[in-house]
A protein has these predicted regions:
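A short, internal acetyl-CoA/4′-phosphopantetheine-binding micro-motif in the GNAT/acyltransferase core
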Residues: 95-104, 133-134
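Conserved acetyl-CoA-binding loop-helix of GNAT-fold acetyltransferases
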Residues: 99, 105-118
Length: 167
């Protein structure tokens, strides 16, 4: 049986402390290919600047998770974001979520999604995201289906494939 993990979830924006930003960047890179790789901390800053709603998870002064989300009408140049922009008038798009491997299976991802879901409900928005199907991310697909998401499409790219989900 796993021990309980004490953690706190905090909202953040582009003005986040550089130490926290650095930890988020390294956690992102540790979680590729489940999340897209970023070439630099500056790329992460630009991503956050374009985003709408973001949270990080901290335990014992260490960032152990994060989620970055966008609303409609962003200038974000992601093909996956553009898919939902064409499909939905208003939406909340989860661009990336990452949990440190050591802290998975403690409900942290679910709690981040519950925060996002609360915002979506308050604003009458669907939550949209994509999950890799090549390379296959079975755990994330199961997580999203268990959380009530339905697959609404898929896309093949030159180096990977994704399934699109909506709740």
């Amino acid at each position: 049986m796993k021990e309980k993990v004490e953690y706190n979830i905090h909202k953040f924006s582009n003005s986040v402390d550089s130490y926290i930003l650095e930890q988020i960047y390294f956690l992102n890179q540790e979680n590729t290919p489940e999340v897209g790789s970023l070439s630099s901390i500056k790329d992460l800053q630009n991503l956050i600047r374009l985003s709408s709603i973001n949270y990080y998870v901290i335990s014992q002064d260490k960032i152990i998770g994060f989620i970055i989300c966008f609303r409609e009408h962003s200038t974000y140049d992601s093909e996956n974001y553009k898919f939902f922009s064409k499909e939905e008038r208003n939406f909340l798009y989860v661009d990336r979520i990452a949990i440190s491997h050591k802290y998975r299976r403690f409900g942290i991802g679910k709690n981040l999604y519950l925060k996002i879901e609360s915002i979506a409900i308050d604003n009458n928005l669907p939550i949209c995201c994509e999950v890799n199907t090549d390379p296959l991310n079975k755990i994330s697909i199961k997580f999203h289906k268990d959380f009530g998401f339905s697959e609404i499409g898929n896309q093949k790219f030159h180096d990977h494939s994704v399934a699109y989900f909506k709740k």
